[in-house]
Amino acid sequence: MMFEKDDLGLSLGLNFPKKQINLKSNPSVSVTPSSSSFGLFRRSSWNESFTSSVPNSDSSQKETRTFIRGIDVNRPPSTAEYGDEDAGVSSPNSTVSSSTGKRSEREEDTDPQGSRGISDDEDGDNSRKKLRLSKDQSAILEETFKDHSTLNPKQKQALAKQLGLRARQVEVWFQNRRARTKLKQTEVDCEFLRRCCENLTEENRRLQKEVTELRALKLSPQFYMHMSPPTTLTMCPSCEHVSVPPPQPQAATSAHHRSLPVNAWAPATRISHGLTFDALRPRS
């Protein structure tokens, strides 16, 4: 039994140096030992330490021989051996997740700053609303607004320096002043339109009343009795080109319409052609 264990241990010990000699004789081969030989070497050293720590008995020798015989040299090493090596390498997914987590942390850190900036702006607006101007400042601003409703940057800076204000405060005052002026002008326009609408409504009522009266007068029979002849109708200025035909001479009209009397027993009349005859003379 001791011979078998020594022989097995010797063969395991000689195989590893032979591998090293072959590597030295062949420089083209990589000097780094393969994972299988390295794992085999670790198993052999672990087995030797295990057998040395176990007491020298028949049962322990049988268990050791069974354990050693169960080792397959040609079997590829298990993935557990590379657990330490794989633990040091991070996967792309983990890298992406870690970078995403860091980015979210940075965004969370920057959010309070943004909210503080917004609150500062709101506070600034409140401070601008609380601005109180003196009478002199208001008078100067009003006079300047009458001359120029808008200011360029240079005029704004000069006016702010003159009044002891900031340029932003002057700009806000002019914006509010323009808004008030526009509102007043809108109110004036609305009042003017309201009056025009009232006048048009009143005129419409008057015209509707006249139309109703004319319709009632047209339907009554007295309208035709008191109607004036067409010759006495007055023409509107737009219809002056339609003129009434001039009246004909009274003599020509009477001669044209005069009828001759017919008398069967009247004496003979002279014909206009100079011939005379006896009307209804009895024959002899």
From Swiss-Prot:
Domain of life assignment: Eukaryota
Q: Where is this region: Leucine-zipper?
A: 193-214
Give the induction note. Rapidly and strongly induced by lowering the ratio of red to far-red light.
In the UniProt annotation, what is the result of changing residue 172 to A? Abolishes DNA-binding
Q: Which InterPro entries match?
A: HD (IPR001356), HD-ZIP_Homeobox_LZ_Class_II (IPR050762), HD-ZIP_N (IPR006712), Homeobox_CS (IPR017970), Homeodomain-like_sf (IPR009057), HTH_motif (IPR000047), Leu_zip_homeo (IPR003106)
What does the record give as the DNA-binding region? 126-185
Specify where the region named Disordered lies, as residue ranges: 48-132
What task does this protein carry out? Probable transcription factor involved in the negative regulation of cell elongation and specific cell proliferation processes such as lateral root formation and secondary growth of the vascular system. Acts as a mediator of the red/far-red light effects on leaf cell expansion in the shading response. Binds to the DNA sequence 5'-CAAT[GC]ATTG-3'. Negatively regulates its own expression.
> What's this protein's family per the entry?
Belongs to the HD-ZIP homeobox family. Class II subfamily.
Q: What is this protein called?
A: Homeobox-leucine zipper protein HAT4
Organism expressing this protein natively: Arabidopsis thaliana (Mouse-ear cress)
